[in-house]
Curated annotation (Swiss-Prot):
Keywords annotated in UniProt: Cytoplasm, DNA-binding, Repeat, Transcription, Transcription regulation
Keyword Repeat (UniProt): yes
Residue ranges of domain SpoVT-AbrB in the record: 6-49, 78-121
Protein name: Transcriptional regulator MraZ
Subcellular location: Cytoplasm, Nucleoid
UniProt xrefs under Pfam families: MraZ
Family annotation (PROSITE patterns): SPOVT_ABRB
Organism: Mesoplasma florum (strain ATCC 33453 / NBRC 100688 / NCTC 11704 / L1)
Alphabetized InterPro entries for the sequence: MraZ, MraZ_C, MraZ_dom, MraZ_N, MraZ_sf, SpoVT-AbrB_dom, SpoVT-AbrB_sf
GO cellular component, one term: nucleoid
Transmembrane spans: none
GO molecular function, a single term: transcription cis-regulatory region binding
Entry's Gene Ontology BP terms: negative regulation of DNA-templated transcription initiation
Amino acid sequence: MLFFGTYDHNLDDKQRLTIPSKMRNKILNSTVYVSKGFEGSLEMRTEEEFEKWSSQILNLSSFNKETRMITREIIANTHEVEIDKIGRIKIPNNLLKLANIEKSVYILGMGDRVEIWDQKSYDNYQNDNSDRMEEIAETIYQGLNK
């Protein structure tokens, strides 16, 4: 199952976010996991993807300080959330604060996961990195052709 596309949504007054129907149709049950992501985003995974992903993190050596730090940061900032009957999730307050989300969000399909961004933060991220995208793509795709 792959998630793709970019969707423009708003949190409602109770801080619930409606998952786009095209994404919701790919989620087999009503439980998803929302975690602190990178670059200021949140990440949402299905139960199956979360189990795979967290297993990889938890299998890293706990004797390494950096591993403990990143494991602590990610796993402690992950919440199991339920999708209600009309396709909404309630994002916990601590995650909203970590991602500077107030109302307007972008929901980005990222293959095996979904990123949730505050719109202003994502627009700034895009503006700050747009000049480098071609260079980065060249480097990445050259590695794929070897």
